[in-house]
């Protein structure tokens, strides 16, 4: 898998879990990015290293192909949204789809939560001292302890955690199963939540097969609702709410492991990545994160001039 393909996969995953994009939308965007990659490959480029001139040439090519205006507009939109995502993740310093380079001084930082921010987020969730607070704390602990995708978290059956296991069996992309470890903090959070879980059961039901049931139409929590709850907790914790999402918690799991010296292949297995190229994204994110810490926290790094 090339770097461009890995970035495209990460973008589509974000669209699925954070924006709850419909399957048809994800399929269309996947084809749009594949179309762009096909054009870029003719000049020896891919999505990760394309320059503004090449992207502009691609946009002009869309207009010359005789595509319907709606299709051409959607493909431009897909590419622009992709590069906004890449810029926001800190994987590039510019947005070639808009011919505007971000100045070095204002380079966006990778969306990585510090360890103390994770603790503040958990404290804000637990401070509610309610069933909702315990549920949110449980979800945060599970994602941060095991690197679960939000779709994997919300698909967990109650039986998966009913007996206080040290590991979860997670069914990921393509139906592939993997083992996800649980630390003591996550197991304690699950125990505390299970006591309050009946408060979330649909009316008229004595139980639900899901670990995180809901009274909504689906019978279980949705990714969008989890995102809203995390944003509320971020505000309460004094953290930029745009910096917090289920996907970013998964990022934090991987980045903090890498910074702690974990092998990249181990992280690949824990995240359920089919290709190591997808996991290698985190080596860049971790490097940027550590450089920022040195620049802002080290006494010499803060000196000007």
UniProtKB/Swiss-Prot annotation:
UniProt record, GO biological process: cell division; chromosome segregation; DNA transposition
A matching Pfam family: Phage_integrase
UniProt-listed InterPro entries: CB, DNA_brk_join_enz, Integrase-like_cat_sf, Integrase_catalytic, Integrase_recombinase_N, Integrase_SAM-like_N, Recomb_XerD, Tyrosine_recombinase_XerC/XerD
Gene Ontology terms for molecular function: DNA binding; tyrosine-based site-specific recombinase activity
Residue positions of the active site: 149, 173, 247, 250, 273, 282
Compartments reported by the entry: Cytoplasm
Keyword vocabulary terms for this entry: Cell cycle, Cell division, Chromosome partition, Cytoplasm, DNA integration, DNA recombination, DNA-binding
Limits of the Core-binding (CB) domain: 2-87
Tyr recombinase domain residues: 108-295
Entry's Gene Ontology cellular component terms: cytoplasm
PANTHER family xrefs: PHAGE INTEGRASE-RELATED, TYROSINE RECOMBINASE XERD
Subunit structure, as described in the record: Forms a cyclic heterotetrameric complex composed of two molecules of XerC and two molecules of XerD.
Family statement: Belongs to the 'phage' integrase family. XerD subfamily.
Role summary: Site-specific tyrosine recombinase, which acts by catalyzing the cutting and rejoining of the recombining DNA molecules. The XerC-XerD complex is essential to convert dimers of the bacterial chromosome into monomers to permit their segregation at cell division. It also contributes to the segregational stability of plasmids.
UniProt-listed HAMAP family: Recomb_XerC_XerD (MF_01808), Recomb_XerD (MF_01807)
Protein name per the record: Tyrosine recombinase XerD
Upper classification of the organism: Bacteria, Pseudomonadati, Pseudomonadota, Alphaproteobacteria, Caulobacterales
Originating gene: xerD
